[in-house]
């Protein structure tokens, strides 16, 4: 052992001056870590430099029907006086006949010299042979060694047992009923040679045969779940507005993750997937077909909902079309963009691309009027999502993003701005890639490289490249197991009930919605002046009689409102009223006023029980027209909202209604309530959802459950959206106790029951209230 001072001076010595006789590892805190340099570390670095500088020789060798690539490295010793060691060589099988590949597979030297051969061979063998044929060649090889020395036979049987065990564990789908004959042959060989029982190699062989028997025996096929059951009624695609975007994204992710976990990577090979449409190949790649079908299902749901059409068959006339206006279609576009954004946060790239590709498809992309009504924020998000899946540089952006998501997955989940919801539990940290990228890579690999060389040998270098792609899929499948999502029966039933349109049907409906040549290019958005109503009394005080009206599309001059005429006012009110959501259009579309022109005075009716704002209420209204910035005006414009509207409130809400079902207990149903829904229609929908007769809706009353065990009874003629209290979204549907119960009141609060909410802040302004009634009577 050298003294410590000499060991520390070793690094400063000239090269070759001192020969290291021994060393000891140092603690990192003493300078042996990254900040310092220990003796052992210096030797390792110098050895690495020597390896990098070592000359490399590469050549091919042919042996027994196989071509090997030999790589030789000549390393120089650290001591120039030491003898030169022999070169280090490694062999990799590059090509060969099928029999030569099987011999190399069962060679005991392969596992140490060519570590990637066995997994690559097992994953890609279906591209050049079948499983029964391969098992037959394995049996042939073992039977050929039966007359060889016992140690060689035992060594080969041990390798074969290890290979078959790995094969069964990593690719169980390869062992079906078609391999039963070859399995019987292997079992009889092991029994004949005495390796089917006992310990050691015999015990492993016996366990292997037992496991193979269990797998090969007839059992129920593991088929993907049907996307639509025969008895399911067709769903309305526009009902997507009923569901929250994050909840819908979670359910799409749940379905995509389940399919991706059941994906068989070897079925993605270009030689299999690329020939799927050939006659007699319809049974190939079932797991890939299921994933692609789900992708097309999501894309079809986007197209059907935006077009407002449901398919009843494949014929051109078997389509039910719901009449929608461009602003309503814009709400549907924005909804799907939000769903895609939520899927992006969940790292579900499959559904993100399904939604984006559907919105980029010709039937949707050509709807200029609808896109012109979409908000700027939605268009900005959509543009960023399109950039992710740009085809530039072979989807380089999506590939890099997927790689980053996998690396940063734990930190991304912990720092996510989306907190887990109690209803669905923790989201987890899984990843669902877009499978089309990998399918394209494998198809291109299959087309770019030959399956066989000029001499007829199987090109195994091609299979190694394919195996690299399949290994990436395997790794992503392990990452996909990190999700923790729960199914939502309502959303999944809606997804199952969707009937997507065919390509021809989509194009025809799109041309009916906007005939070619009738849609002008969307004009650039123009920032319009904003009107601020500081006090409600200013509006009513500026009205001197039933005819003078307030102009809502011009800014205030000197703090006073400029009066307008009745006809322009109705037109401007029609422009600034928020368009109804599609889901508010119940089954009776023909009777809904919003299906007609909103500029028609006969269809502008005030809500039945709209609470009046207080004196100090302030409200801003965006004054854009429907064709230029109208969507922003709709989302930020003047609205009346009942029950204490807050930031982000809109013209629809989702409430939970509990209905007592006698001995069956009680259930909750989620109902979408819009600004046009009155109590009878809401009660009827609740009864229908609970499989009750909606004709007896008059026998029930709707009660809002408020904090503090209070109740708010909704009158039969009231508009539920405006009458409800914003403090709670829980309701109770019960049989009417007293027919006279028609007064809005808080049953548990004496102070609240004294003054109905309809008196609001106007109880001290009787003249203003009377004037307001006159205005409403004159206008409507």
Swiss-Prot record:
Keywords, in A-Z order: Guanine-nucleotide releasing factor, Phosphoprotein
MF (Gene Ontology): guanyl-nucleotide exchange factor activity
Listed Pfam families: RA, RasGEF, RasGEF_N
Domain Ras-associating: from-to ranges: 651-738
Comp. bias regions, Acidic residues: 43-65
Entries under InterPro entries matching the protein: RA_dom, Ras-like_GEF, Ras-like_Gua-exchang_fac_N, Ras_G-nucl-exch_fac_CS, Ras_GEF_dom_sf, RASGEF_cat_dom, RASGEF_cat_dom_sf, Ubiquitin-like_domsf
Ranges where the N-terminal Ras-GEF domain occurs: 89-213
CDD domains: RA_RGL2 (cd17211), RasGEF (cd00155), REM (cd06224)
Phosphoserine carried by residues: 13
Sequence ranges of Low complexity compositional bias: 596-613, 741-758
The Ras-GEF domain, residue ranges: 244-516
Region (Disordered): 1-92, 596-651, 741-769
Family matches, as SUPFAM superfamilies: Ras GEF, Ubiquitin-like
Bias kind Gly residues: ranges: 31-42
UniProt record, GO biological process: small GTPase-mediated signal transduction
Physiological role: Probable guanine nucleotide exchange factor. Putative effector of Ras and/or Rap. Associates with the GTP-bound form of Rap 1A and H-Ras in vitro.
Quaternary assembly: Interacts with SAMD9.
Protein name per the record: Ral guanine nucleotide dissociation stimulator-like 2
Lineage: Eukaryota, Metazoa, Chordata, Craniata, Vertebrata
Gene for this chain: RGL2
């Amino acid at each position: 052992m050298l003294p410590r001072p000499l060991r520390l001076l070793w690094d400063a010595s000239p090269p070759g001056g001192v020969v290291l006789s021994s060393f000891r590892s140092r603690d990192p805190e003493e300078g042996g870590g990254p900040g310092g340099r220990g003796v052992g570390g210096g030797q390792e670095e110098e050895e690495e430099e020597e390896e990098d500088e070592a000359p490399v020789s590469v050549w091919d060798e042919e042996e027994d029907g196989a071509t090997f690539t030999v790589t030789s490295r000549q390393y120089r010793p650290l001591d120039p006086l030491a003898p030169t060691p022999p070169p280090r060589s490694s062999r990799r099988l590059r090509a060969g006949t099928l029999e030569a590949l099987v011999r190399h597979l069962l060679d005991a030297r392969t596992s140490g010299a060519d570590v990637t051969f066995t997994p690559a061979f097992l994953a890609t063998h279906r591209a050049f042979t079948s499983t029964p044929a391969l098992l037959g060649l394995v049996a042939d090889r073992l039977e050929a060694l039966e007359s060889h020395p016992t140690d060689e036979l035992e060594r080969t049987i041990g390798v074969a047992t290890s290979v078959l065990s790995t094969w069964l564990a990593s690719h169980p789908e390869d062992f079906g009923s078609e391999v039963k004959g070859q399995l019987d042959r292997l079992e009889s060989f092991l029994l004949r040679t005495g390796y089917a029982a006992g310990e050691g190699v015999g015990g492993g062989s016996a366990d292997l045969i037992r496991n193979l028997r269990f797998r090969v025996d007839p059992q129920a096929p593991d088929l993907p779940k049907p996307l639509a059951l025969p008895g399911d009624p067709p769903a309305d695609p526009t009902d997507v507005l009923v569901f929250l975007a994050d909840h819908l994204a979670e359910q799409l992710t749940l379905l995509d993750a389940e399919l991706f976990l059941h994906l068989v990577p070897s079925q993605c090979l270009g030689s299999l997937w690329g020939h799927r449409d050939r006659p007699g190949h319809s049974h190939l790649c079932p797991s890939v077909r299921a994933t692609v079908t789900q992708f097309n299902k999501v894309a079809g749901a986007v197209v059907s909902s935006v077009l407002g059409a449901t398919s009843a068959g494949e014929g051109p006339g078997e389509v039910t079309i719901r009449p929608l206006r461009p602003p309503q279609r814009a709400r549907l576009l924005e909804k799907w963009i939000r769903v895609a954004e939520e899927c992006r946060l969940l790292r579900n790239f499959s559904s993100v691309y399904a939604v984006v590709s559907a919105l980029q498809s010709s039937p949707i992309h050509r709807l200029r009027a609808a896109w012109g009504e979409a908000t700027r924020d939605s268009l900005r998000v959509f543009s960023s999502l399109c950039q992710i899946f740009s085809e530039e540089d072979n989807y380089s952006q999506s590939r890099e993003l997927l790689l980053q998501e996998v690396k940063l997955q734990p930190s991304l989940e912990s720092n996510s701005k989306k907190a887990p919801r109690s209803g669905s539990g923790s989201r987890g940290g899984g990843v669902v890639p877009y499978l089309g990228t990998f399918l394209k890579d494998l198809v291109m690999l299959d087309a770019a490289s030959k399956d066989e060389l000029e001499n007829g040998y199987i090109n195994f270098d091609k299979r190694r490249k394919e195996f690299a792609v399949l290994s990436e899929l395997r790794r992503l499948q392990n990452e996909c197991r990190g999700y923790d999502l729960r199914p939502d029966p309502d959303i999944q039933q809606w997804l199952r009930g969707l009937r997507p349109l065919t390509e021809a049907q989509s194009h025809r409906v799109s041309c009916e919605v906007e005939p070619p040549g009738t849609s002008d290019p969307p004009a650039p958005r123009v920032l319009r002046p904003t009107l601020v109503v500081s006090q409600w009394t200013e509006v009513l005080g500026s009205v001197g009689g039933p005819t003078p009206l307030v102009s809502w599309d011009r800014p205030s001059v000197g703090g006073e409102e400029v009066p307008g005429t009745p006809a322009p006012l109705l037109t401007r009110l029609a422009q600034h009223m928020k368009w109804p959501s599609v889901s508010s259009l119940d089954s009776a579309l023909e009777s809904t006023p919003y299906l007609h022109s909103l500029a028609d005075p006969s269809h502008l009716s005030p809500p039945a029980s709209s609470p009046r704002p207080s004196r100090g209420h302030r409200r801003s209204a965006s004054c854009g027209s429907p064709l230029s910035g109208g969507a922003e005006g709709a989302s930020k414009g003047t609205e009346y909202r009942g029950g204490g509207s807050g930031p982000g409130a809109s013209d629809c809400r989702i409430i939970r209604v509990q209905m007592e079902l006698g001995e069956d207990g009680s259930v909750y149903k989620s109902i979408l309530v819009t600004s046009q829904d009155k109590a009878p229609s809401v009660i009827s929908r609740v009864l229908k959802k609970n499989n009750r007769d909606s004709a007896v809706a008059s026998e029930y009353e709707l009660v809002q459950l408020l904090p503090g065990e209070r109740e708010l009874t909704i009158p039969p003629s009231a508009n539920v959206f405006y009458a409800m209290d914003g403090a709670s979204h829980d309701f109770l549907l019960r049989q009417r106790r007293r027919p006279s119960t028609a007064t809005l009141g808080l049953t548990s609060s004496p102070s609240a029951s004294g003054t109905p909410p309809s008196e609001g802040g106007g109880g001290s302004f009787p003249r203003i209230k009377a004037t307001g009634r006159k205005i409403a009577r004159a206008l409507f």
